[in-house]
């Protein structure tokens, strides 16, 4: 009977970085040479960079535009502004939205007039007399 605990030789301690120095078996070698995950990762990185480049070229953020070092309005009112076509586009889209809304709900109806009360009886008679000949 031994009074000491389990020996370290019988149960090796697993290091957090043990997978880096683990011997390569034939099964893991095939997984390591599979290029599909690497190609997917490269494609995602490429798409992310291309999207950023496209945004920078098309939208031209004010922080990157050297001609706009001074303070400026968000919605310029001068006609030579490059953002005016976008404003026209938003107006057209708003008009389209309103026309689709009115098409779905039909034409607006004329608000109904309340029925004439006893105090309106005289004006109703005047109206009837003016139409009779």
Curated annotation (Swiss-Prot):
Keyword Ligase annotated: no
InterPro entries to which the protein is assigned, alphabetical: DUF5527
The protein, known as: Uncharacterized protein C10orf105
Cellular location(s): Membrane
Residue stretches of biased makeup (Basic and acidic residues): 119-133
GO terms under cellular component: membrane
PANTHER family: GENE, 17455-RELATED, MCG55969
Lineage of the species this protein comes from: Eukaryota, Metazoa, Chordata, Craniata, Vertebrata
Membrane topology of this protein: Single-pass membrane protein
Principal location: membrane
């Amino acid at each position: 009977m031994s009074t000491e605990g389990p020996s370290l030789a019988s149960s090796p301690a697993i290091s957090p970085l043990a997978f880096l120095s683990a011997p390569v078996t034939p099964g893991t070698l095939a997984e390591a040479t599979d290029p599909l995950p690497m190609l997917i990762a490269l494609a995602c990185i490429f798409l992310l960079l291309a999207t950023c480049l496209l945004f920078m070229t098309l939208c031209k953020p004010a922080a990157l535009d050297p001609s706009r070092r001074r303070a400026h309005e968000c919605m310029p009112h001068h006609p030579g502004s490059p953002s005016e076509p976008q404003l026209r586009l938003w107006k057209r889209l708003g008009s389209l939205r309103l026309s689709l809304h009115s098409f779905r709900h039909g034409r607006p109806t004329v608000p109904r007039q309340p029925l004439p009360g006893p105090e309106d009886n005289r004006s109703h008679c005047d109206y009837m007399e003016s139409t009779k000949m």
